[in-house]
C-alpha cells in the first residue's frame, strides 16, 4: 500500500520541494532506498551519501538542504528536526501496513464474568483476565497474557504475548508492554530478626501513566505500602529492574539492563545508559543524564551529565579511593599553589 508524498506532508508538516504526487510505500536507509521509498538525513557527516541516494524523497534540515540540493535529484522535505520527522513518518507507514487485531475475545481466553472488556478490545488466545479487571477501548492483549484482579488497562494499550500484569496495577492510554515483562511482582522486602528473613507483604501496586513503553523481560515491582509509579511518556528498554516504591518522572528513558533499587525518586526528562545502577532511597533531579555502566550512589540535585565507575575492591578501600578521586580538583589547586610557592622561594637571591 502506498501514499502520496503530498498527503504525508499534509499530515506531518514540513516544506515539500518537488512532486507532491509521487507514491511511496515506506522508509529505507540512505544506501538501500529506491524510488518507492523516502529516507532521511539527520547527521551532516552523511551528506555525501544523501546526495547519491536513489530515494524518491529525502527528509533533511534547512542547513543540509543548502548543501545537498545541488546534487540530489529527488523531492525534499525540509524540517527543523529530521530525526523526529523520520520517527513520525515511520509510525505512519507502520500503521499503514499493520495487521489490525480483530475486536472480541478469543474462545480459548479465560475472562472472569466481573471483568469489564470494551467491545473494541482484542483479547487473544489463552489470555487470562481476573475478577474486576478493566480493559478499555482499542486495547490489544496478545496470546498468553495474564491480567490480574482489579487491574486496569487504558485505551489503545498493547500487550505483546506473555505479559504478566498483576493485581491492582494500572496503565494509562496508548501504552506498549513487550513480551515477558512482569508488572506488579512483589518488591524485595524483608525484615531480619536473628539472622532470619521475615517477608513484608507488598500491598501497594504499580501505577503507570499514558504513552509509556516497557521492554521485553523488564520487571517493575509493586510497592510495599504505596504504589510504584511511572509517569507519562517513560520509555524502558529490555531487561530493566525497577524496585518497589520507585517513582520515575515523566519522559525519562532507560536503556537495557538498568537497575533501580527500591524507593529511588527519579526526575523528569532523565536518561540512563545501559547497565547503569541506581541505589535505593536516592533522589535524582530533572534533566539528569547517567552514562552507561555508571553507579549512582548518592542523590543528584543538579541537572547535567554524570559518569562514575570504579573497579571492584573491598568496601573500605573503595570508599577511601572515592574520597580521593572526588577531591582531586581541590588537591590539584593546592599542588599548583605549592609549586608557585616553591618556585618563588627558588627565585629569591641567597
UniProtKB/Swiss-Prot annotation:
The keyword Repeat applies. GO terms for cellular component: membrane. Pathway: Bacterial outer membrane biogenesis; LPS lipid A biosynthesis. Keywords: Acyltransferase, Lipid A biosynthesis, Lipid biosynthesis, Lipid metabolism, Repeat, Transferase. It is an enzyme of class 2 (transferase). InterPro entries: Hexapep, LpxD, Trimer_LpxA-like_sf, UDP_GlcNAc_AcTrfase_non-rep. GO terms for molecular function: N-acyltransferase activity. CDD domains: LbH_LpxD. GO terms for biological process: lipid A biosynthetic process. It catalyses: a UDP-3-O-[(3R)-3-hydroxyacyl]-alpha-D-glucosamine + a (3R)-hydroxyacyl-[ACP] = a UDP-2-N,3-O-bis[(3R)-3-hydroxyacyl]-alpha-D-glucosamine + holo-[ACP] + H(+). The active site is at residue 244. The keyword Lipid biosynthesis applies. It holds the Pfam family LpxD. Its EC number is 2.3.1.191. Catalyzes the N-acylation of UDP-3-O-acylglucosamine using 3-hydroxyacyl-ACP as the acyl donor. Is involved in the biosynthesis of lipid A, a phosphorylated glycolipid that anchors the lipopolysaccharide to the outer membrane of the cell. NCBIfam families: lipid_A_lpxD, PRK00892.1. Belongs to the transferase hexapeptide repeat family. LpxD subfamily. Homotrimer. This is UDP-3-O-acylglucosamine N-acyltransferase. It comes from Janthinobacterium sp. (strain Marseille) (Minibacterium massiliensis). The lineage of its organism: Bacteria, Pseudomonadati, Pseudomonadota, Betaproteobacteria, Burkholderiales.
Amino acid at each position: 500500500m502506498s501514499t502520496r508524498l503530498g498527503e504525508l506532508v499534509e499530515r506531518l508538516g514540513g516544506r515539500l520541494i518537488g512532486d507532491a504526487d509521487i507514491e511511496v510505500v515506506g522508509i529505507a536507509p540512505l544506501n538501500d532506498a529506491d524510488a518507492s521509498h523516502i529516507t532521511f538525513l539527520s547527521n551532516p557527516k552523511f551528506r555525501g551519501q544523501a546526495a547519491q541516494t536513489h530515494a524518491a524523497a529525502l527528509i533533511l534540515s534547512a542547513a543540509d538542504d543548502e548543501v545537498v540540493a545541488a546534487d540530489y535529484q529527488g523531492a525534499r522535505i525540509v524540517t527543523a528536526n529530521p530525526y523526529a520527522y523520520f520517527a513520525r513518518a515511520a509510525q505512519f507507514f507502520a500503521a499503514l501496513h499493520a495487521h489490525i487485531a480483530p475486536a472480541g475475545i478469543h474462545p480459548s481466553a479465560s475472562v472472569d464474568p466481573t471483568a469489564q472488556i470494551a467491545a473494541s478490545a482484542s483479547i487473544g488466545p489463552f489470555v487470562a483476565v481476573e475478577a474486576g479487571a478493566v480493559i478499555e477501548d482499542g486495547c490489544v492483549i496478545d496470546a498468553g497474557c495474564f491480567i490480574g484482579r482489579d487491574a486496569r488497562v487504558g485505551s489503545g494499550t498493547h500487550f505483546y504475548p506473555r505479559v504478566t500484569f498483576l493485581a491492582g496495577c494500572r496503565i494509562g492510554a496508548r501504552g506498549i508492554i513487550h513480551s515477558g515483562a512482569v508488572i506488579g511482582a512483589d518488591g524485595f522486602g524483608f525484615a531480619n530478626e536473628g539472622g532470619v528473613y521475615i517477608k513484608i507483604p507488598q500491598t501497594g501496586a504499580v501505577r503507570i501513566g499514558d504513552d509509556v513503553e516497557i521492554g521485553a523481560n523488564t520487571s517493575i515491582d509493586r510497592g510495599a505500602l504505596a504504589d510504584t509509579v511511572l509517569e507519562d511518556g517513560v520509555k524502558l528498554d529490555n531487561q530493566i529492574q525497577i524496585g518497589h516504591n520507585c517513582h520515575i518522572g515523566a519522559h525519562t528513558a532507560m536503556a537495557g539492563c538498568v537497575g533501580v533499587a527500591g524507593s529511588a525518586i527519579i526526575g523528569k526528562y532523565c536518561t540512563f545508559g545501559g547497565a547503569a545502577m541506581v541505589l535505593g532511597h536516592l533522589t535524582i533531579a530533572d534533566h539528569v543524564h547517567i552514562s552507561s555502566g555508571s553507579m549512582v550512589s548518592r542523590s543528584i540535585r543538579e541537572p547535567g551529565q554524570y559518569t562514575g565507575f570504579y573497579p571492584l575492591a573491598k568496601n573500605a578501600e573503595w570508599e577511601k579511593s572515592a574520597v580521593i578521586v572526588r577531591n582531586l580538583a581541590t588537591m590539584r589547586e593546592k599542588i599548583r599553589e605549592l609549586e608557585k610557592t616553591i618556585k618563588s622561594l627558588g627565585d629569591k637571591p641567597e
